[in-house]
Amino acid sequence: ILFIYMVVHLYKLKSGPKKFKAEFIDDKTKKRVKSVSFGFAGMSNFTKHKDPERQKRYVDRHRKREDWTRSGKHTAGFWSRWLLWSDPSFSKALKITEGKLGERIIYKH
């Protein structure tokens, strides 16, 4: 059995339609395996507005069509849910996301 250990590099995007990009890096070869851009740049999120009612509405609206489990880690929905909509504190949301992901995240501002 071959195990590939991943590290995720998280970037805040300075331009374009998305807020962030997560790149999955093979920790042994240091090569990018997959990347996911997420978070519509023109919209707010829980880490910005900190409104629990808006968070609940977001979660209810997206719950049925997105995979928020570890198997959905390569989807924008997974990243938006855990990084942008899990906690009003970005640093706490980052820790929550890392726990849900099961892999190390390196935030590269």
Task: List each language-model region with its residue ranges.
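Arg/Lys-rich, low-complexity, intrinsically disordered basic segments
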Residues: 3-109
